[in-house]
């Protein structure tokens, strides 16, 4: 059984990681542990590189905390231009897989508050009245009318980041 450490306590991220690992390695093949670790970047990262650095830092911090695991996984959400997206970073003892999620264009009224220094989650919670929306459907769920959620978009990126771990060509 694979021991997988999720460098997050966010239920939407954990759900995406668990589902993707079960799809790739088989139902019941993984034990998931969740840990809160620092990203080393601002609460609301801007740009692809800062966001990816946050995910890489979370993986490194999770590895230091639980070095006996088989996989360490981090999902870091950020803002790039006028859109929100995330980076997924997965490592095992010998390799790394990374993938960037789909992007969601954000309305100007939301971007204005984020650019003033607020994190997207609290801005969206105020806008929607949904407490801790970032731990639930997120802006993605709101602006896609529930057709997608944070977890569903993260799930796809986790599947992509897992590619090196089950394909010999890597």
From Swiss-Prot:
InterPro entries, sorted: ITPase-like_fam (IPR029001), Non_canon_purine_NTPase (IPR002786), NTPase/PRRC1 (IPR026533), YjjX_NTPase (IPR050299)
Listed GO biological process terms: nucleotide metabolic process; response to antibiotic; thiamine metabolic process
The UniProt record lists the keyword Zinc-finger: no
SUPFAM superfamilies recorded: ITPase-like
EC code(s) of this entry: 3.6.1.73
Single annotated GO MF: ITPase activity
Cofactor info, note text: Binds 1 divalent cation per subunit. Activity is maximal in the presence of Mg(2+), while Mn(2+) decreases the activity by 20%.
Modulation of this protein's activity: Competitively inhibited by ATP, GTP and TTP.
Catalytic activity: XTP + H2O = XDP + phosphate + H(+); ITP + H2O = IDP + phosphate + H(+)
Cofactor: Mg(2+); Mn(2+)
Record's keyword terms, sorted: Antibiotic resistance, Hydrolase, Magnesium, Manganese, Metal-binding, Nucleotide metabolism, Nucleotide-binding
Gene3D superfamilies the UniProt entry points to: 3.90.950.10
Name of the top EC class for this enzyme: hydrolase
Binding site for substrate: 8-13, 68-69
Positions of disulphide bridges: none
pH dependence: Optimum pH is 6.75.
Positions with a binding annotation for Mg(2+): 38, 68
Subunit composition and interactions: Homodimer.
Family: Belongs to the YjjX NTPase family.
Function, as annotated: Phosphatase that hydrolyzes non-canonical purine nucleotides such as XTP and ITP to their respective diphosphate derivatives. Probably excludes non-canonical purines from DNA/RNA precursor pool, thus preventing their incorporation into DNA/RNA and avoiding chromosomal lesions. ITP and XTP are the best substrates, followed by GDP and dITP. Is not active on dATP and dGTP, and exhibits no phosphatase activity toward pyrimidines (CTP, TTP, UTP, dCTP, and dTTP). Also seems to be implicated in the resistance against the thiamine metabolism inhibitors bacimethrin and CF3-HMP.
Protein name: Inosine/xanthosine triphosphatase
Annotated source species: Escherichia coli (strain K12)
Lineage, broadest ranks: Bacteria, Pseudomonadati, Pseudomonadota, Gammaproteobacteria, Enterobacterales
């Amino acid at each position: 059984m694979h021991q997988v450490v999720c460098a997050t306590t966010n239920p939407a991220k954990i759900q995406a990681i668990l589902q993707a690992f079960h799809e790739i390695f088989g139902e019941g093949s993984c034990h998931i542990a969740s840990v809160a670790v620092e990203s080393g970047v601002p609460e609301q990262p801007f740009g692809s590189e800062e966001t990816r650095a946050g995910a890489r830092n979370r993986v490194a911090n999770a590895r230091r905390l639980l070095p006996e695991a088989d996989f360490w996984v981090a999902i870091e959400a950020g803002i790039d231009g006028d859109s929100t997206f995330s980076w997924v970073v997965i490592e095992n003892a010998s390799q790394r897989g990374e993938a960037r999620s789909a992007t969601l264009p954000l309305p100007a009224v939301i971007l204005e508050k984020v650019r003033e220094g607020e994190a997207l989650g609290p801005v969206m919670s105020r806008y929607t009245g949904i407490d801790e929306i970032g731990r639930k459907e997120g802006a993605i769920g709101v602006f896609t009318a529930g057709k997608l959620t944070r977890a569903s978009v993260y799930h796809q990126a986790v599947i992509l980041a897992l590619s090196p771990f089950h394909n010999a060509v890597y």
